[in-house]
Amino acid sequence: MKGAVSISVRLSDLFKYYKHGLPHQDAAVKMLEEKLMAAYPDLMHKDQEWFKVWSQAGKQTVNEKLVLNVPYESQRDNKSGAGFRECFSSSAAMVAKFYGKVSGDDEYNSIRARFGDSTDSAAQIQALRFLGLHAEFKQALNVGSLEKETSEGRPVLVGWLHHGSYKAPSGGGHWSVAVGVDDTSIIHNDPYGMADIVNGGYKSAQGGKYIHYSKQYWLPRWLVEGPNSGWGVLISE
């Protein structure tokens, strides 16, 4: 039709595939946002009609929570032959892979080995920083920390006690990746599989991706010394 404008990209098509937390998609959205702000500053205000329609006057379902698209790695098949004790490395590898720094936990393990043992938090921090990531070991995290980090697109390494009853957790500790938080659960990528968070130990070697661990039973295993005592590693680009 004469005078018609050709549209090369439809936002409606792009939104179908957008996942907050994917670095390349977030970067592209930021670029588009900056272009729109520069060319049409008024269009980006919340009082605009398009935003009211989008938000349905603030009536979105509050239970719709973000789960980050973190690739899964199992510690059980590590080429090192020591996968049974490499939960920390396989968890760190998932986050490094999420940021596009490694191909998997075997590659990550070869890098981490330069800095120390898999159980050594300092070795993990050095390996992550070597890959160009910001990494900080923390011992005073809480549920709010996980909500903030995951809602802003950053998965968190969490260290917790996986043996014994949730009422009296024990053991040397286990590491997994917190990829989201909902009203009743902390959502994990657990490199060892599906934990029995009520009684301790593991139910299955399978099912470790996007597993919902009930806050009622998992938090006592993480917040052992109080509501602000969670161990974890905060990682960002």
Language model segments and positions:
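Active-site-adjacent substructure of cysteine-protease-like catalytic cores
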Residues: 138-197
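Active-site-adjacent structural segments surrounding the nucleophilic cysteine of cysteine proteases
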Residues: 3-117
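Noncatalytic regulatory segments and standalone regulatory/sensor domains
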Residues: 68, 181-237
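Extracytoplasmic/secreted proteins, especially bacterial periplasmic and envelope-associated proteins
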Residues: 13, 27, 31, 86, ...
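Short, flexible beta-strand-to-coil junctions
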Residues: 34, 160-164, 236-237
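A structural signal for well-ordered alpha-helical scaffolds and beta->alpha junctions
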Residues: 89, 120-121, 211-212
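Catalytic cysteine-centered active-site loop
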Residues: 102-145
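Short, surface-exposed loop and linker segments with low hydrophobicity and enrichment for Pro/Ser/Thr
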Residues: 1-5, 39, 142-156, 224-229
